[in-house]
Amino acid sequence: ISRNKEELMKIDEGDKIDYLSIRFSHPRWMIENWIKQYGYEFVEGLCMENNNRPKLNIRVNTLKITREELSKRLSSYGYMIRKTSYAKDGIIIDNPVRITNIDEFKLGFFIIQDESSMLASQILNPRENSLVLDLCSAPGGKATHLAQIMGNKGRIISRDIYDHKLNLIKQNANRLGIDIIKVQKFDAMKLDENLIEQVDYCMVDAPCSGLGIIRRRPEIKWNRNKEDMKQLDNIQRRILNNAKKYIKPGGIMV
């Protein structure tokens, strides 16, 4: 085997779907679907990126500290950092060893959160003293970011269906010093008649395939199938159809 190693490792490039599936260790059905939507070159780059080790992103809690000041503190501890490309309050840490053990984390100066998640709240951009509804809210990264954008002024209703997830929202809000979030146990697939046309802004992080975080959880590739995608599509439609009814005329949903 060792003598024929190079020959054994060759992958037939004749079938482009098989080639990407084998080379980058992704299910064939997934590659096939992606190529139909995005084209071969994009999918090749996506698969390559999925196999890279992700960097840790944190969101600065600007209610307590500026990004510049926190950056200085982290650098003084030996952390290699840089600003996120698009999120205004994000920092990328290349060597996040024991990052949750430092005082700045315990004091609520930052929360671990992907840049893509930060951008959702940044786009919604709720005003102070607004009423915001955050559906499928746990663990509260977006809810606490929305509160931060609002200057901790107004009201945010954060809903999820599990008690332990609601507790995560409370814990994160408490550590960050945020007190405008009210957690509620509620199934987003059910319509709440009492909230129709009541909220100024609505954030919907509907249950999804998780394929966008393959770098962080590579096992997701093998825990999903085509049937899962169809079921999730139905769930998402029901939640979104309910959510749009809660927004006041002129309100915004992301």
List each language-model region with its residue ranges.
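S-adenosylmethionine
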Residues: I1-V254
